């Protein structure tokens, strides 16, 4: 699937926030908003998290099959189609059980990244300010 740089960044950031929310007890107990925690993180901590997830998510996003996406909607894939791509990209060095766990976890991670994608805009629509000053 072809994604723009902005879409890839939004997907990766959305998945990173999901992982961060799962790691932090204060976010899980709804004491702190995940966006607040994300903004309070220093750049290096964000980079480390995004770098680790990028190796897992980006190859799968690129390998997903092309689908027709109507303007104003997000691309969506079934868990089965994402799992097939993840299995195809997974190496043979893992055992059967570890491979199955990795495929399920990475499929969930990619689905959270896809959920964070912004809606597609119509490339033929002229959007911009009403007046140029």
Walk through the language-model features, giving the residues of each.
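Alpha-helical propensity feature that highlights long, continuous alpha-helices across diverse contexts
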Residues: 1-133
């Amino acid at each position: 699937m072809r994604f723009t740089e902005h879409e890839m960044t939004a997907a990766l950031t959305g998945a990173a926030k999901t992982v961060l929310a799962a790691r932090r007890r204060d976010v899980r107990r709804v004491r702190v908003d995940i966006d607040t925690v994300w903004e309070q993180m220093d750049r290096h901590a964000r980079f480390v998290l995004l770098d680790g997830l990028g190796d897992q998510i980006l190859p799968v996003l690129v390998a997903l099959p092309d689908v027709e996406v109507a303007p104003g909607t997000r691309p969506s894939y079934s868990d089965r189609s994402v799992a097939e791509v993840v299995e195809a990209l997974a190496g043979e060095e893992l055992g059967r059980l570890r491979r199955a766990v990795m495929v399920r976890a990475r499929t969930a991670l990619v689905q959270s990244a896809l959920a964070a994608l912004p809606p597609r805009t119509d490339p033929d629509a002229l959007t911009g300010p009403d007046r140029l000053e």
